[in-house]
């Protein structure tokens, strides 16, 4: 997959960069693997905004993705690669030898007709799923479990990965794409390869409407608000806020660490993320 630059026939198209989806499935998703998803627009059950800048967006069907990969020893053939509106990565439709079908996160390089399998004896090829203790040091993996059998939670978005750095008894050391180095139980499963759609970071939507299709509402600057709405609000004429940048709740917003110091999982993190 790649990106496509559009002809600059308008001012907004001049900077627009979109994904080239010509190699993806153009039909409907597998009917047995979809469910309805209701957009809450960032509201909770009482109608109160709990997440700002969220809107309705385009209607979507949720694709049920298999993050556990617990069909051990059963080979599956990749029927097709599909676009998933609910995530940045592409997904692959698998057809198992016993007739069952499922969606998985598509790793980079996976293509129609490839055969994948889950199990300790599997080859180190993109799409195969193994226990971390069975994967060679230096291998790039994704969809990594934190608790055995609970399904992958690490490295699932487009272009992300975790590299197996070393093995130490019950644990292995993983370096995430953020730079964080973390201990994970060696009995957890992971899938070989880097997540597909590496060019997602280069996309430029080009117009406000595409953001609205994705369910993203406008972000208003604090200095444009009233004093009751934001610490930067108010003032006569155009003002700069008069203080160091903060969130609407007064928390410094330029690099302040927000992770709790006494979090129980701190003992598993050997090096914090380069991105803070």
UniProtKB/Swiss-Prot annotation:
Gene3D superfamilies: 2.30.30.30, Nucleic acid-binding proteins, Ribosomal protein L2, domain 3. One of its GO terms (cellular component) is large ribosomal subunit. One of the primary rRNA binding proteins. Required for association of the 30S and 50S subunits to form the 70S ribosome, for tRNA binding and peptide bond formation. It has been suggested to have peptidyltransferase activity; this is somewhat controversial. Makes several contacts with the 16S rRNA in the 70S ribosome. Disulfide bonds: none annotated. Part of the 50S ribosomal subunit. Forms a bridge to the 30S subunit in the 70S ribosome. InterPro entries: NA-bd_OB-fold, Rib_uL2_dom2, Ribosomal_uL2, Ribosomal_uL2_bac/org-type, Ribosomal_uL2_C, Ribosomal_uL2_CS, Ribosomal_uL2_dom3, Ribosomal_uL2_RNA-bd_dom. One of its GO terms (molecular function) is structural constituent of ribosome. Transmembrane segments: none annotated. This is Large ribosomal subunit protein uL2. It holds the Pfam family Ribosomal_L2_C. It comes from the Bacteria. Residues 254-270 have a biased composition (Basic residues). Keywords: Ribonucleoprotein, Ribosomal protein, RNA-binding, rRNA-binding. Residues 224-276 are annotated as: Disordered. Belongs to the universal ribosomal protein uL2 family. NCBIfam families: rplB_bact (TIGR01171). GO terms for biological process: cytoplasmic translation.
């Amino acid at each position: 997959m790649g990106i496509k630059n559009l002809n600059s026939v308008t001012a907004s198209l001049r900077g627009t960069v979109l994904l080239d989806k010509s190699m993806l499935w153009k039909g409907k998703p597998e009917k047995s693997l979809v469910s309805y998803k209701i957009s809450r627009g960032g509201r909770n059950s009482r109608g109160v905004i709990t997440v700002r800048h969220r809107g309705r967006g385009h209607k979507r069907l949720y694709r049920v993705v298999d993050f556990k990969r617990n069909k051990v020893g059963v080979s599956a053939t990749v029927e097709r690669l599909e676009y998933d509106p609910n995530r940045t990565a592409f997904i692959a439709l698998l057809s198992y030898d016993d007739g069952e079908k499922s969606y998985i996160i598509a790793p980079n390089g996976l293509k129609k007709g490839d055969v994948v399998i889950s199990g300790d004896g599997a080859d180190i090829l993109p799409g195969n799923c193994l226990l971390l203790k069975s994967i060679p040091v230096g291998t790039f993996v994704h969809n990594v479990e934190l608790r055995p059998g609970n399904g992958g939670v690490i490295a699932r978005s487009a272009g992300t990965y975790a590299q197996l750095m070393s093995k130490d008894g019950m644990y292995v050391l993983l370096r995430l794409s953020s730079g964080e180095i973390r201990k994970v139980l060696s009995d957890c499963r992971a899938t070989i390869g880097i997540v597909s759609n590496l060019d997602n970071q280069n996309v430029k939507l080009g117009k406000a409407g595409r953001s609205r299709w994705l369910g993203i509402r406008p972000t208003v600057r604090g200095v444009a608000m009233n004093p009751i709405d934001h610490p930067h609000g108010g003032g006569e004429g155009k003002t700069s806020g008069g203080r160091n940048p903060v969130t609407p709740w007064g928390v410094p917003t330029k690099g302040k660490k927000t992770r709790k110091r006494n979090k129980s999982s701190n003992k598993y993190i050997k090096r914090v993320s380069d991105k803070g």
